[in-house]
């Protein structure tokens, strides 16, 4: 875990995997885990989202998974935890962007798991993220290579 400006970076590196992991993203099939790949978690102070950047063995981003959250904080074990608001946004460097789990958010509202304020916050943040990704302006995506290098320089890998 690395503090980097107003962000906390957590880097998980896969040295050898038994089998690559592929996911679907807006009609694309994307490999997010294989030998040498890394998952970089980016948590900005005060942000309403937590980003997982999936990077290939060369450190190039291949996929972003963005959890929409109410808040995040450092847990007693020193690792980040967050209050998930159900919605997620996934994207690829090729420009595919997809909103996930809208039905889960609707069900959570109907079951009083989230308040109407949390529901509106989730929708607003997800919309902001989608528009920023589509416009190439979502900072965690734009700065993935920089964040990856910073995290690796501290871990010495």
Predicted regions and their residues:
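A short, polar/proline- and glycine-enriched secondary-structure boundary/capping micro-motif
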Residues: 21-22, 75-77, 108-112
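Cysteine/selenocysteine-centered motifs that mediate thiol-based redox chemistry or coordinate metal-sulfur cofactors
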Residues: 124-157
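Charge-rich, low-complexity N-terminal segments
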Residues: 1-37
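A long amphipathic alpha-helix within ATP-dependent nucleotide-binding catalytic cores
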Residues: 66-69, 73-76, 80, 123-136
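Residues immediately flanking
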Residues: 14, 68, 102
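Well-ordered beta-strand positions
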Residues: 1-3, 43, 90-91
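A hydrophobic, small-residue-rich beta->alpha segment in the mid-to-C-terminal subdomain
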Residues: 85-129
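Phosphate/ribose-recognition catalytic cores of enzymes acting on nucleotide-derived substrates
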Residues: 34-74, 80-87
